[in-house]
Every structure is written in C-alpha cells, then in structure tokens.
Regions:
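Cytoplasmic membrane-interface "Motif A"-like loop-to-helix N-cap segments
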Residues: 64-76
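Intracellular juxtamembrane helix-capping segments at the cytosolic ends
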Residues: 108-121
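A late C-terminal transmembrane helix in Major Facilitator Superfamily
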Residues: 123-155
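A membrane-interface helix-boundary motif in multi-pass transporters
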Residues: 149-169
Length: 185
C-alpha cells in the first residue's frame, strides 16, 4: 500500500537477511575457502555476528542524530566496497578485517532502517515493522543458496563472487532509496 515500505523491506532484506545469511555461511567460508580449522572458523563467525548485532544500537543512535537516510547510505556504500574487497586474494587475517567491515555495514544499516520506518510509514508503523522485519529476514534464506550456487559453478572463485551479491544489492538499495527519499520529500 505504501511504496516506501517496500524500499525499507529491500534495505532490511539486504543487511539483516545478509547478517543471518553470513552467520550461517561464514563457518563454511572460513573452512573451505580459507583453510581454517573449525574452532577458528566458529570464533571468527561469532565475532562477526556479535559485532553486527551490537552495532545496531550505535547505528540507531547515529540515525537519531544525523538522519537514518545518511547512515543507511553510508552503511550501504561500505557494504558495496567490502563485497568487492572480499574478491581480492589476501590472507585470512585481512579477509577477516574486511568481513568486519561487512559486519559494521550490516549493524549500522539495520539500526538506520528501523529509524526510517516511522519516518516513511508514519501512519502504519506497527504493520510496516512487521513487513520490514519479516520479509527482511527472508534474505537470510535467499542469499546462502545463491552463494552456494556460485561455488558450484566456480569452486575456485565462487566464494568471493558470492560477496558480490551484497555489492549488487547494496547498490540497488542505494538507487531505490535515493529515489524513494526524493519522492518522500
């Protein structure tokens, strides 16, 4: 009914769904793509997940101060760049640092998206939050099979290429959000 709701759904699909997807995906990535033992793979994944979850709060606070649109666009730009960087051959330590950039982007954008719901859908915040949260979480089920398919197609490059899905979605959301923000104003 309200087009901006779908803009917010896609935004949350990309970063909250992405958070869920990579929390499930990273143990396999660290073991198979980077050759790490399962304990270290689990530890790196835990740091990624905890950081993204904790950064929702400062993402929301910063959105209160400077606006959710600015925080969201900055976080999505960071995600787009980090998705590209995950394709550059580097050691596991540098790759982990880039994964933390993705975590920062996810956390900040998730906080910003929740700030934007009452801004764009003030007449139906509760219902819109249901749509944004419910359909946004669906990204957690969509991304892993797509990433797995890329590994099937190209075992050597597929793990890195999977992160380009986040680059693509981040850029798509930035474009849609830009035009959605113009329409709202």
């Amino acid at each position: 009914k309200i087009p901006q709701t779908w803009m917010l759904v896609l935004c949350y699909f990309t970063t909250f769904g992405g958070f869920m997807a990579l929390t499930a995906w990273f143990p396999t990535f660290w073991k198979k793509a980077m050759g790490l033992d399962p304990m270290l793979a689990g530890g790196l994944t835990a740091v990624f997940s905890i950081l993204a979850a904790l950064l929702r709060v400062p993402g929301g606070r910063l959105s209160d101060r400077i606006g959710g649109e600015k925080v969201s666009m900055g976080a999505l730009a960071l995600l787009a760049v980090a998705g590209i960087l995950m394709n550059i051959p580097m050691g596991w330590g540098a790759t982990f640092v880039v994964s933390l950039l993705i975590s920062v982007a996810f956390g900040f954008n998730n906080g910003a998206t929740m700030k934007l719901v009452p801004v764009y859908v003030s007449e139906g915040v509760g219902g819109a939050n249901g749509w944004v949260g419910g359909l946004g979480a669906f990204g957690g089920f969509v991304f892993p099979p797509l990433m797995g398919r890329l590994v099937d197609i190209s075992p050597q490059y597929g793990y890195g290429l999977g992160f380009l899905l986040f680059t693509f979605f981040a850029l798509l959301v930035m474009i849609i959000n830009y035009f959605g923000m113009i329409r709202k104003k």
